[in-house]
């Protein structure tokens, strides 16, 4: 249960946490509370991302309020749910090791954790991916027998997919990759060595830049909160400039920082290793510079791991620098890049059903049209599960259409997903039951 835990936690200030009294409904919940009730009075990780209502802190087996399509601070990828996706036909995924120095420093955490050093947490997550693979193997008959297989080459991925298993690509999405900040002295030789080291660990997918400016370049501006956090992490605010048509978000606009010299060196090294380079958190200037380097390197394909699209959104403080423009998509398509559609959308003007499969379809069809049409376009979905974002909301029930009453009433008369349903070639599926909770896509969303 998420109410409390027996892990050795300390507070965000490294002080002792009080021992809790477990509720009668969960008699053995643990000794220390992970977080409060998601109210504004609680720590930033509990309240800052909108996980409401109060009393949503019970996890397994009750699941009284989370996970939901809008919950952002809780585990959304329990292994049985991942298995269901595989059984339903998913055959390739990226498993990203992720951490955020600012969020780590704002939350209860394991004793001894140094939030200023991100890579040890990344190492632990990569090791855990291999341990998870071994654990599944042990449940399936021994080494290599499980349905979850970490792959390191396209040929390996194809072989795994052909035998009906899930091919898993390991990746890293972190704000301070290799510990390289603007204020330290990482060298090209050090960075090249780190790329080699993580390549040997099986990593093939890299975000050179994430939420903050760093040693490799400028971050896309899309959230005012991150500007304040950038001061804490990098010691300086973002410096922005107007970029009409790309960002309407007031003073946020676009980052003046592109790739640093070290960043350009990293991009070249990643291309030489044949790794996936994800541009999705880069500033527009860094994106342009990375595309230019890719063209110089024989039209090297790039990656958009959780795509949002500028033209899908109306102007008026809804578009921002992390959204891909039509011009960027044209260049990415010419390189043979992979561009995903994020399961969170920020569309605020849909006339039918906000933040639902309707708006996801709108973004998906736009991506297909820009990337070669339905005959050739292969569009992944970018879930960003556990990435402090929402997902595809429900079309029916109390919270449908992002609580838009008129849309909810109109949608109620439209056909629903009928359970059980059959996916040709993959079998028959009823509602997902986990613990004491039965999930229904119609009323729960993704």
Give the predicted meaning of each segment.
Residues 1-253, 261-268, 272, 287, ...:
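N-terminal hydrophobic targeting/anchoring segments and the immediately downstream early-domain regions
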Residues 276-279:
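Short catalytic-loop micro-motif centered on adjacent basic/acidic residues
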